Amino acid sequence: MTLWLIEANQNRRRLIDRSFQPCFYVHGPAARLARLGQALAARARVACGLTERTDIWEGEGLRVLQVTVHHPTQFAALGRFVHRYDSALRLYNSDLMLAPLYCWEKEVFPLAKVELEVETPRWGVSPVPAGKCVETAQRAVSTVRAIECRDDTWATDYELPPLRVMRVRLEGLAQVDPQHGRRGALEVEIDGEWRVLDDSEEPVAAGFARLLRTHDPDLIVSEWGDSTLFPGLLRQASKGGLELPLNRDPVAPVARSRARSYTSYGRILFKGSTTTLFGRLHVDAQNSFIADQCNLEGLWELVRVTKLPVQYCARTTTGTGISYMQMELAYRDGVLIPEQKAEPESPKHPDELLRADRGGLVIPPRLGFFTGVAELDFVSEFPSIMARFNVSPETVNCRCCPEAPRVPELGYRVCQRRRGITSRVVERLIKKRQQYKQLMSEGGEEPGEGRPNYKLRRSALKWLLVCCFGYTGYKNARFGKIEAHESINALAREKLLVAKETAEQQGFRILYALVDSLYVQKEGARREDYERLGQEIEQRTGLPMALEAVYRYVVFLPSKQHAEIPVPNRFFCVPEEGEVKIRGLECRKHDTAPLVARMQREALKILSEARDFRSYSRKLEEARAVLERYLARLESGGASVEELVISRRLTRSPRDYQHASATAIAAKQLDRSGVQLRPGEMIEYIITDADSNYPDDRVRALTLWEGWRGYDVKKYQEVLREAFEPFEHFAASGAT
């Protein structure tokens, strides 16, 4: 295993740990296991022996063959060999990533502070001596004799390594994929200073290589580095015979993976190609959900708790992080980790299925303008249910507790003898989030001089907790079991009903309820009354409940298609203090033109100054002035193209579209220009003449748009008016 460290003297050092020998397990008849052991020994350096490990579902010991692999590079291949050799045998721990497995075994994690005992080769330490071949280079590196962690995964006050950071991007709009056509010069930022590289004096790859050698960054943060920047620089360097030291590691090539389209819960999504480095870290801000949502501070937090490699953690889902946290606990408990999900759904009568296959409880909102409204939320409700009631895939309908308490509505049993793996994982995450919340309350939410951004760290942990519920029912989750998913939903429904009944018994009116939130109103109620209600609900349900906010007013909006029908998640709330809460409006949607989103937010800022319906009506006139100003800007041609960009996700390949929708037209324009598009990719376009008889004149892909085409003033004005309509919807009917 190759390790890269920053020493106390700031030296960067490459080390090899040859003591790491991962193992996997095989279950089957004794005679077959004996033959398998002989076959494995004939293929590779392995040590085989019978041992006992715990089965996740039975909770009992299982006799298995332990296969210890002397060369980690053969680990995955030997697991595949077992499949080919005897497909009836069951494998465990055989397809785990080696880096987390190393961390589990050595009790370390990425970015941790460690203490090492190192053996140095006779010709010196890394970097590798010039002129050495690859085989010699491997031996020339210092070897780890012992490693000990001097850090704690669950610490909140931790020190991060002093990483040297370089940022790279192309000139132009960051959100527009440069592969769609328009590419500017390469911009590189080091220590706050930006440099521009183009081909005017030397190849861009040559200039970038020089900066890499001069500044030797530990971390490169890019925009579109995975799919465009680094592949393009590598191609240019290869054609020109240039050496481009993207990697620090002298014996490893840059790792690439292909882009792919896939389906998830009925949505067509796209995962871009990746370019990962060895000896350096590369994070592509356009290809990292967690870096986009929580910046690098949130990414470092996830890396520490999941023990996933930094570059992998940046690009994978938070669900993978939860899975590896579950697997680490299983590993430490001596529990076998199934290679793939092996627990099928239990057979159910149709009546049972109808009862079980339901989500959270929703009480539709009362339409209208309401003053003096409070929002009460169960804190991390689904994770709290898992932790409080021990709901985990292996604990639901266990075989050891026939008299265990039953899940309401469903009658499922929950184990009383062993603590569930998922329950323990979420319990630790909840506790750490609470610690960060306490630190925020003591020192303020915003980071100060030398103080970490606890808000971003807490947000990163939230994303882990958000997905842990879904993974209990995910069809491919190793520790997934649909009955656990159904149990959590059933308990959540029961707790929300208890909360509703408690509120109504105390004279509060329920305006809206959604899974884990209640919007309540009571004439003359003060903040203390709502806090007491939350405490009463918490006492009755056993789940933590918080007063999220007291709102001066809330506007619950109907369906866009049917003005009399309420819909969940289309409303806006103005609190006594803090930010306006918005759901379902255009300014919350990723595909809305920036001009429209900005108009809505400006109008809301004015409306948020109102305290009741009468003052809201007065402020509405001021908000209309905002709308008129934006309409006039469009009319005068004063809107910039960046403000008018509309983004859409492709649901199919460009040539498979049958109808001339705006998305189809723009996609086909890009396709004809030579851009290769795949289902799930995002494209951007400008509306140029929505009513034209010629489809190509209706919209123009952003990277193909020319200034002389202009934009469709009438259509964009129509969109602005539609976006303003929610604010006027109840203006004539009055408050409730």
Describe the role of every protein-language-model region.
Residues F469-N476, F508-S517:
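Core alpha/beta catalytic barrel or barrel-like domain that forms the active/cofactor pocket
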Residues R183, I190-D191, L219-T316, S323, ...:
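Metal-dependent phosphoesterase core characteristic of DEDDh/y 3'-5' exonuclease domains
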Residues P217-D226, L511-Y512, Y519:
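Short glycine-rich phosphate-binding loop at a beta-alpha junction
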